[in-house]
């Protein structure tokens, strides 16, 4: 990695508040970080209630918003140098990686970008084979490796 590596954070919307904290920690280490558009909106408003942003559940006409958010983040991944997956516990499952983050990881993998995952991979995932096949760097909750790689 060259100095000035741009890290794109990928995460379930349920983890966006944590993602903002991780972003702040990486920025303090001199790393450029991009978070999803909804995470930026949550940070600006201070409202981290996911339901307030996922309006397509109530109004199917809003799925175009979901599509735009996905496309925008895919563009951010394409323009970044690596991704960091925030995979906290969700629905009682440690290391949760949902379908949207799997798609983002697949894009990064296809583009030969390093994939960092904050916590251990989920146990008994229906896509365990695919996750392991992307050869991610598992940080085990510690950002030091990512920071070191980004500063080289």
Please give the residue ranges for each predicted region.
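Conserved catalytic or regulatory cores that recognize and/or transform ribose-phosphate-containing ligands
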Residues: 1-152
């Amino acid at each position: 990695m060259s100095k000035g590596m741009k890290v794109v954070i990928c995460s379930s919307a349920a983890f966006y508040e944590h993602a903002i904290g991780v972003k702040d920690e990486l920025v303090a280490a001199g790393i450029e970080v991009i978070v999803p558009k909804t995470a930026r909106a949550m940070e600006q408003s201070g409202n981290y209630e996911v339901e307030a942003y996922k309006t397509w559940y109530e109004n199917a006409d809003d799925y175009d918003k979901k599509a735009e958010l996905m496309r925008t983040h895919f563009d951010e991944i394409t323009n970044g140098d690596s991704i960091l997956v925030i995979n906290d516990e969700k629905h009682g499952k440690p290391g949760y990686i949902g379908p949207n983050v799997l798609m983002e990881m697949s894009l990064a993998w296809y583009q030969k970008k390093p994939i960092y995952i904050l916590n251990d991979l989920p146990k008994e995932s229906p896509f365990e084979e695919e996750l392991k096949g992307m050869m991610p760097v598992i940080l085990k909750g510690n950002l030091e490796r990512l920071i070191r790689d980004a500063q080289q």
